[in-house]
């Protein structure tokens, strides 16, 4: 299996994600090279920080077109934390900022009156089956650090929700697109299982393509 590409655009906890996949036995490469990203059998878009800065960095490095090509070709693509948010159309962070627009919906700030960022362990419920959560019971705790949340326009893409001031989507799946708001690489054994499930999706997609 060729390495899974972890996109380096200057705004991710790349080492933790890389170490987690190494531990699981999947070959990985951290790269900002569009050619390596489009050639990879699976791609991970991590990220922490501001939405507008992230989009600016992706544009500057010529990675927006590469990510869109990966998505259109049916290659498994996983967004983590800010990486999940970037998959959507727009964010209200820093005004109205355009995202990758791979999924219709917007990113909103968590409501006033609760402690922001939402930081720590929280339960995730599964409103419908998701391939990332295979073998994981509903109500499992995962580790979060975020101030904004996704509002998908299509309810059927939502595979996980949590409650913090309000109930909101924290996991999506549509075709080859996957995303989680929590940090699987910081979520202990269950988080590793999420990454393993993604790794197996990549492996099977690669086998099916040959």
From Swiss-Prot:
Statement: the UniProt record of this protein carries the keyword Nucleus: no
InterPro entries: Class_I_gatase-like, GATASE, Imidazole-glycPsynth_HisH
Lineage: Bacteria, Bacillati, Bacillota, Clostridia, Moorellales
Chief location bin: cytoplasm
Pathway(s) annotated for this protein in UniProt: Amino-acid biosynthesis; L-histidine biosynthesis; L-histidine from 5-phospho-alpha-D-ribose 1-diphosphate: step 5/9
Protein purpose: IGPS catalyzes the conversion of PRFAR and glutamine to IGP, AICAR and glutamate. The HisH subunit catalyzes the hydrolysis of glutamine to glutamate and ammonia as part of the synthesis of IGP and AICAR. The resulting ammonia molecule is channeled to the active site of HisF.
Subunit structure of this chain's protein: Heterodimer of HisH and HisF.
Listed Gene3D superfamilies: 3.40.50.880
GO biological process, one term: L-histidine biosynthetic process
EC number: 4.3.2.10, 3.5.1.2
Localization: Cytoplasm
Reactions the enzyme catalyzes: 5-[(5-phospho-1-deoxy-D-ribulos-1-ylimino)methylamino]-1-(5-phospho-beta-D-ribosyl)imidazole-4-carboxamide + L-glutamine = D-erythro-1-(imidazol-4-yl)glycerol 3-phosphate + 5-amino-1-(5-phospho-beta-D-ribosyl)imidazole-4-carboxamide + L-glutamate + H(+); L-glutamine + H2O = L-glutamate + NH4(+)
Active site: 81 (nucleophile), 183, 185
CC annotations in GO: cytoplasm
NCBIfam families: IMP_synth_hisH
Keyword list, A-Z: Amino-acid biosynthesis, Cytoplasm, Glutamine amidotransferase, Histidine biosynthesis, Hydrolase, Lyase
Domain of life: Bacteria
Gene transcribed to yield this protein: hisH
Protein name according to UniProt: Imidazole glycerol phosphate synthase subunit HisH
PANTHER family: IMIDAZOLE GLYCEROL PHOSPHATE SYNTHASE SUBUNIT HISH
CDD domains with a match to the protein in the record: GATase1_IGP_Synthase
MF-aspect GO terms: glutaminase activity; imidazoleglycerol-phosphate synthase activity; lyase activity
Secretion signal, residue range per the UniProt entry: none
Record domain Glutamine amidotransferase type-1: where: 3-208
